[in-house]
């Protein structure tokens, strides 16, 4: 039976202050549990995912942010598992689902080529990014990203899960990926 350590979970409205606090509270745990190399990779992927939540958080007509975004990090025997969640409109879901499906369909070499293509051929979006975040998360995680969209309140809540191997020699993607 695989053991699991629940490290942190947060659900609500995210902003840079909350993101900074999450990162501060988890950084020490990561360094205590694993090598600096593994901790650095997990920390980087936490930053990227939390930035995605904050930047792409839905705001209602009054400008108030959606109050149900989600971040969870667990440490299992073979891998860290990070889950992000956010509410998206039907229009955003369609584009996001296509983008995620394209990313998941690529192997390591194709992901690197896709990353370079985006880097060389795209400008910045209205949110300040170039569309590299999800591709980079896929490149730096172990195995495929997994995602799911659940209908809720006229839109969709989407979950994104990724795993980071603690020891690549002992990592079994099938064992580590049974999350969502």
Model-based region annotation:
Residues 8, 28, 179-180:
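Conserved small-residue-rich
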Residues 48-52:
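Conserved polar catalytic motif of the HATPase_c/GHKL fold
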Residues 25-47, 120-127:
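Conserved short strand/loop->alpha-helix "switch" segment adjacent to the catalytic nucleotide/phosphoryl-transfer site
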Residues 17, 44, 129-133:
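Charged, alpha-helix-enriched surfaces in structured cytosolic catalytic cores
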Residues 6-20:
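STAS-typified acidic loop motif
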Residues 37-43, 54-61:
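Short N-terminal amphipathic alpha-helices
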Residues 1-4, 20, 27-28, 32, ...:
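A generic structural signal for ordered alpha-helices
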């Amino acid at each position: 039976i695989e053991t699991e350590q629940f490290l942190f979970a947060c659900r609500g409205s995210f902003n840079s202050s909350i993101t900074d606090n999450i990162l501060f509270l988890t950084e020490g745990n990561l360094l205590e549990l694993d090598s600096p190399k593994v901790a650095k990779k997990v920390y980087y992927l936490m930053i990227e995912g939390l930035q995605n939540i904050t930047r792409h958080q839905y705001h209602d007509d009054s400008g108030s942010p959606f109050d149900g975004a989600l971040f969870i990090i667990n440490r299992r025997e073979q891998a860290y598992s990070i889950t992000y969640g956010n509410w998206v409109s039907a229009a955003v879901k369609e584009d996001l689902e296509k983008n995620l499906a394209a990313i998941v369909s690529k192997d390591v070499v194709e992901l690197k080529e896709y990353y370079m293509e985006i880097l060389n051929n795209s400008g910045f979006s209205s949110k300040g990014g170039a569309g590299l975040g999800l591709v980079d998360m896929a490149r730096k995680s172990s195995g495929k990203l997994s995602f799911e969209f659940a209908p809720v309140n006229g839109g969709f809540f989407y979950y994104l899960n990724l795993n980071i191997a603690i020891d690549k020699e002992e990592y079994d993607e099938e064992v580590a990926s049974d999350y969502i």
